[in-house]
From Swiss-Prot:
GO BP: L-histidine catabolic process to glutamate and formamide; L-histidine catabolic process to glutamate and formate
Main location: cytoplasm
Cofactor names: Zn(2+); Fe(3+)
Protein name: Imidazolonepropionase
Presence of the UniProt keyword Lipoprotein in the record: no
Gene: hutI
Species classification: Bacteria, Pseudomonadati, Pseudomonadota, Alphaproteobacteria, Caulobacterales
Cofactor binding annotation: Binds 1 zinc or iron ion per subunit.
Enzyme nomenclature, EC number: 3.5.2.7
Length: 401
């Protein structure tokens, strides 16, 4: 078999559906041709390769490249001072009334140029890449005007031209109410549905549409309007749901066959059943749970029992999860949410790909999929979940390079 390069003497965690557990292959080989996996499996069953390059990984573990399916990487400014205020006892509402919160980030993002947003996002992206991330989802949602949302999405797309990484973009105009619409919520939803979504779809700048369904965000009726507009323009949807309260957002998302419903601390049985029926992925965000000192854990056992796929993400954002470590996310999911090692590793690979609608293309080590790999200096895959403040990444491979 002709191939561009082959990795030999490897241990594989393929995460392939149908294989038991992590899909472990103790003496494995991965071969790449044209940026796609040509073979991933036991050396004993491998064809004879005619490879331009052969790489001996000396018994290291190879997993699919990690995928971060929920981030807000593109923003300007920071909210460290608000963190200090919260530690001193100020409530989120008090900080918001004083001009902080999402509106603070909105002001900084609006004031920044596209080039400045790219420059600010690069260190955050680089931190993800340093831990094996090969695909990242990036949301808008800090511009909250047509021009600034377009600017944010262009900046997110530009990151894929600067770094070797896959980027998917999500329009999150229904994130918060900008000050100029303080007394006209439905007027802002009109803007999102009638102006922003058509303009963004026409430019091909978004791969999906998201919303924040909460008492401090947007109502289910308003989110339904956003979803209808998204569907009218051929865009799949996803939703921040049940983070702070239960507004049945997950069930609403499932009604629209959403790719994912995210957060889910307050998810109920009806929402779980709806997600299971629609195949909507539960994207869990333990960093936000930790940082906001939430006490209600997402219903992991019920999600597991219902067969709802569970993805994990950093939720990197300046207000509630200033986190750029998928390895720490896995540890948090195991320790705080009681997820298994297998669930954690699947959550940042296979199920993360599923949450982005990309499972046919990446997220597992299978022939035909993108040759996105993470090669690790560990003795067993559980170390990736078990250890904290530890980065054993040996090499990151994107599209075979």
């Amino acid at each position: 078999m002709r191939c561009d390069r082959v990795w030999i003497n490897a241990r594989l965690a393929t995460l392939a559906p149908g294989r038991q557990g992590l899909g472990i292959v103790e003496d494995g080989v991965v071969a790449c041709l044209g940026g796609r996996i040509a073979y991933a499996g036991p050396a004993a069953a491998a064809p004879t390769f005619e490879a331009a390059e052969s790489i001996d990984v000396d018994g290291r573990w190879i997993t699919p490249g990690l995928i971060d399916p929920h981030t807000h990487l593109v923003f300007a400014g920071d909210r460290a001072h608000e963190f200090e205020l919260r530690l001193a006892g100020a409530s989120y509402e008090e900080i918001a009334r004083a001009g902080g919160g999402i509106v603070s980030t909105m002001r900084a993002t609006r004031a920044a140029s596209e080039a400045e947003l790219i420059a600010a996002a690069l260190p955050r992206l680089d931190a993800l890449l340093a831990e094996g991330v090969t695909t990242v989802e990036i949301k808008s949602g800090y511009g909250l005007s047509l021009d600034d949302e377009l600017k944010s999405l262009r900046a997110a797309r530009a990151l894929a031209d600067i770094r070797r990484v896959g980027v998917t973009t999500t329009f999150l105009g229904a994130h918060a109410l900008p000050p100029e619409y303080r007394d006209d919520e439905d007027g802002y939803v009109d803007l999102v549905c009638q102006t922003m979504i058509p303009a963004i779809a026409a430019r091909g700048l978004a791969d999906a549409v998201d919303g924040f369904c909460e008492g401090i965000g947007f109502s289910p009726a308003q989110i339904r309007r956003v979803f209808d507009a998204a569907k009218a323009h051929g865009l799949p949807v996803k939703l921040h749901a049940e983070q702070l309260s239960n507004l049945s957002g997950a069930a609403l998302a499932a009604e629209y066959n959403a790719l994912s419903a995210d957060h889910l601390e307050h998810l109920d049985a009806a929402g779980i059943a709806a997600m299971a029926a629609s195949g909507t992925v539960a994207t869990l965000l333990p960093g936000a749970y930790y940082f906001t000192r939430e006490t209600l854990v997402p219903p992991i056992a019920a999600l597991r029992a219902a067969g709802v796929p569970m993805a994990l993400a950093t939720d990197c954002n300046p207000g509630t999860s200033p986190l750029t470590s998928p390895l720490l996310v896995m540890n948090m999911a195991a320790t705080l949410f009681r997820m298994t090692v297998e669930e954690c590793l699947a959550g940042v690979t296979r199920e993360a790909a599923r949450a982005l609608g990309l499972l046919a293309d990446r997220g597992t080590l299978e022939a035909g999929k993108a040759c996105d790999l993470a090669i690790w200096d560990v003795e067993r895959p559980a170390e990736l979940v078990y250890r904290m403040g530890f980065n054993p990444l040996h090499a990151r491979v994107w599209r075979g390079l």
